[in-house]
Regions:
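A short, N-terminal "cap"/entry segment at the start of jelly-roll beta-barrel domains
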Residues: 1-24, 117
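A short, compositionally biased micro-patch
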Residues: 26, 52, 75, 82-83, ...
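Short acidic-glycine-tyrosine-enriched beta hairpin
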Residues: 63-84
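Glycine- and acidic-residue-biased ligand/ion/polar-headgroup-sensing regions
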Residues: 26-27, 45-62
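Short beta-strand His + acidic residue motifs that chelate non-heme Fe in jelly-roll/DSBH
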Residues: 33, 59-60, 80-82, 86-92, ...
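Double-stranded beta-helix
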Residues: 90-119
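Conserved short histidine dyad/triad with adjacent acidic residue
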Residues: 22-44
Length: 119
């Protein structure tokens, strides 16, 4: 008899201000109705998640000194969670994606710092 799947596994450290994980439950599982407590949290490092709906996009991940560490190609249905660090996107095919990050939004002037790495 197969063991029932019931649980969650989070991949982010507990202290991270952006939590992501995997929920796995067998058919018939029901979580009781609930809401999440209102707790004041200090967020000083914005995290972001992209879910590509259509098209193709390259996500470039950089070290703090400008070294390209990795390039990840995402297609429709793919997702990436950016916890910390410098990143860029390069659109390969016309794309549309969902972007999720913490709020509130404080305006463009407070949102991004653009880096010009000299090659």
């Amino acid at each position: 008899m197969a063991r029932a799947r019931c649980g969650q596994r989070f991949f982010s450290p507990p202290e991270s201000s952006f939590q992501f994980g995997l929920l796995a439950h067998d058919a018939g599982f029901k979580e009781p109705p609930h809401y999440h407590k209102s707790v004041t949290r200090l967020i000083d490092d914005l995290q972001q998640m992209f879910v590509v709906q259509r098209g193709v996009v390259a996500v470039e991940l950089y070290s703090d000194d400008g070294e390209l560490l990795r390039e990840v190609i995402l297609k429709a249905g793919d997702a990436i969670v950016l916890i910390h660090g410098i990143h860029a996107i390069r659109v390969i095919e016309d794309m549309q994606c969902i972007s999720v990050k913490q709020g509130p939004f404080l305006g463009l002037e407070n949102d991004k710092v653009f880096i010009d790495f000299k090659k």
